[in-house]
Design a protein with these regions (language model features):
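N-terminal maturation segment of proteins
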Residues: 1-129
Length: 129
């Protein structure tokens, strides 16, 4: 979106956000599929993400009680940004970020396949307008 083109610290924050979300998926999978110990998960988070041990501990304890939540969150983010990229590519100058967000966020919490259809319908409505 070009949001951080002139903001190196903002870009760094965004990249940190992506790293954190990716590491959450690794830790969630490590705990629930690879049977990592609590300590292994905390150590991974500290080493890979640079988080303080106390923060990493709280995050790991949360993932222990909600299997798959971290991965589903990241999947939702990936699908959402994919829908937005598709809309921008198909609509070009007719793409309006505010209208896009209104359309896809108005459906609330919804399965990702439904969200994809909402995005596709919104794109189609803008192409014919």
């Amino acid at each position: 979106m070009g949001m951080y083109d002139d903001d190196p610290l903002g870009r760094l924050g965004y990249l940190k956000f992506l790293l954190f979300r990716a590491n959450r998926c690794v830790v969630d999978t490590g705990i629930h599929h690879l049977r990592w110990t609590r300590e292994q998960a905390i150590d991974y988070f500290v080493a890979q993400d640079g988080e303080a041990p106390g923060f990493a501990t709280r995050e790991v304890e949360r993932y222990c009680s909600t299997p798959g939540q971290a991965c589903s969150y990241k999947l939702g983010h990936t699908v959402f940004t994919g829908i937005r990229a598709k809309a921008k590519a198909k609509l070009g100058d007719r793409f309006d970020i505010k209208d896009f967000h209104e359309a896809v966020l108005n459906c609330g919490r919804t399965p990702l396949d439904i969200l994809q259809r909402v995005g596709d319908d919104w794109i189609a409505s803008r192409q014919t307008a």
